[in-house]
Amino acid sequence: MKLARVLLDGRAYEARVEGEELVTTWGQRIPMEAAVLLPPTEPSKVICVGFNYRDHAQELQVEIPQEPLFFLKPPSALVAHGQPVVYPPHTRQLDYEGELAVVIGRRCRDVRPEEAREVILGYSIFNDVTARDVQKVEKQWVRAKAFDGSAPYGPWVETELDPSDVRITTRVNGEVRQDSRTRFMIFDVFTLVAEASRYMTLEPGDVIATGTPPGVGPVRPGDVVEITVEGIGTLSNPVTGEQPADTRRGR
């Protein structure tokens, strides 16, 4: 089942996807092309994982991690399917990173990998938008990865998916930039859920973005980024705003 959130008359409502329609909990049917989708859950936190594909770590010339490298994005970074990613003024290289997202279904702490499936609601799609030039010079990734608009998430949550070997494809203006499968992850989905739950309580709706495969690269205003995950669908976001000719550093 695909679970979504939709904006109707200025309010958010839950819905399920049936073919090319959204069906609300009271039975109203909304054509997909007319729907205004919201991020499919309201996470208390977004947990991201760095360098979880060996060949991605190699393309960025970093060491292969021996344990998951976690970092956080705030809920204010979220962007819904179809909504714009506004080019931030503090970077000159804004990169896409297509990822599979795990969505937590119930409150949990200290989950074992073999129990992780029981606390997962389902899976979605995530774009870990990154100010790459900032990331390269700063040890903390707040300005590089936690700014407003850095977390496109959606379009819905698929509750019936085997995440062990699904295809992830990222296109920019229709051109394939990333094409890989989740079987190439260093740490699988259930290990990531278990490890994250060792350090923080996971709440319903929380998101764990599981890392990006190789092929990351920059986007410019006017580009459209489409990330497709087999069995889920496609997350699409245009890039708007202006790419700065200069940035101020040292603040």
Regions found by a protein language model. Name each.
Residues 109-123:
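N-terminal accessory regions of nucleic-acid-interacting proteins
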Residues 73, 98-100, 104-106, 124-129, ...:
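Short, structured patches in soluble enzyme cores that scaffold and shape functional sites
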Residues 1-68, 161-163, 169-171, 175, ...:
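N-terminal non-catalytic cap/leader segment that marks the start of a structured domain
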Residues 48, 80, 95-97, 203, ...:
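Residue-level recognition of short, solvent-exposed, well-ordered loop/turn junctions
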Residues 39, 56, 64, 87, ...:
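Catalytic-pocket segment enriched in acidic/His residues
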Residues 64-81, 96, 226-230:
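Structural signature of FAD isoalloxazine-binding scaffolds in flavoprotein oxidoreductases
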Residues 30-35, 64-65, 79-91:
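Short acidic (Asp/Glu) patches
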